[in-house]
Amino acid sequence: LTNGLKRNVERLFDDKGHVFLLALDHAQSGVMTGLENISSLMDKLAFAPLDGFILNIGLAGNLARPPFLRKKLVLRTSFGASSLASSYPQAHLNHVSPETALSVGADAVLMMALVGGEDYSSLQPLAADIDAFHQYSIPVVVEIIAAEFDKTATFDVQYHGARIAAELGADAVKVFYVNGFEKVIECCPVPAILAGGPKDRDIGTVAKHAVDCGARGFAFGRNIFQAKDPLEVIGSLREILG
């Protein structure tokens, strides 16, 4: 890594080596419950103990104002298809240039790695995109999902996918909790950030075990913004992460 990229990767994490992100990048779902008015939601959580937000390009401007100026912007730069599409895509292609990411003040970018199926159509462009952002010393976080989406939270997808993404140059990976999660962390040479995913498990229990296994952060969405009391959930998760 270049010195500039090293500095930028380190600055993504706090002094304890942790990062807590609120994921609001659900454009594929159109209007998701809890995200009817993202700007209003962000205002309500402005002073919550979050380190930053994951946003799509069209909402990045929400962080260009007090009190968000010191919050991290992790910019999602890839997109697949909407939930209304007739079929699920085999690749989420990048649609934001490094220059545009810099122009909106992104601290890092986030893109998908789809593994399984015809994953060469996803992984080859991913490797090139990582390299393109690294030319500008922009950190890249890669989220691991399955080409058959319902297999995303399976051990093989997360275990092998995280390692593949790291070897293609990812600076951190966003991974889903699976049985055997400690092996995912053990065999991944870059920091792992836990994704929230569906609300079918107690998020506090999952989060604590993930941190015990070595996860370096959280990137949660629905488990927070669809909660009865998002601030309470954020507070309890921050306590777990430290």
Predicted regions and their residues:
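N-terminal basic/disordered segments at the start of proteins
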Residues: 1-14
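Alpha/beta enzyme core
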Residues: 14, 19-61, 65-68, 72-82, ...
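A short, acidic, flexible beta-alpha connecting loop/helix-capping segment that sits on the rim
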Residues: 222-228
